[in-house]
From Swiss-Prot:
Keyword Ubl conjugation: no
Provenance organism: Ceratophyllum demersum
Major localisation: plastid
Assigned GO CC terms: chloroplast; cytosol
Presence of the UniProt keyword Acyltransferase in the record: no
Protein name as annotated: Translation initiation factor IF-1, chloroplastic
GO molecular function, one term: ribosome binding
Compartments in which it is found: Plastid, Chloroplast
Subunit structure: Component of the 30S ribosomal translation pre-initiation complex which assembles on the 30S ribosome in the order IF-2 and IF-3, IF-1 and N-formylmethionyl-tRNA(fMet); mRNA recruitment can occur at any time during PIC assembly.
Length: 77
């Protein structure tokens, strides 16, 4: 049976080496996020200040996988 993941939204606060990021979730928890393979393959740039969707395991709530970068309202693209 596949493990159920919790999906949260958050804000990238800091960029760390090797595709890791510090993410502040909407419930004010800080977790460590890493980029999913699909985002890595698509060359999607994630920078501090971006809003993202992050998938968190219910067994380890301190780490999560960034699965989607949300569009900024003030960008032109």
């Amino acid at each position: 049976m596949k493990e159920q993941k919790l999906i949260h939204e958050g804000l990238i606060t800091e960029s760390l080496p090797n595709g890791m990021f510090r993410v502040r979730l909407d419930n004010e928890k800080m977790i460590l996020g890493y980029v999913s393979g699909r985002i890595r393959r698509s060359f999607i740039r994630i920078l501090p200040g971006d809003r993202v969707k992050i998938e968190v395991s219910r067994y380890d709530s301190t780490r999560g996988r960034i699965i989607y970068r949300l569009r900024n309202k003030d960008s032109n693209d």
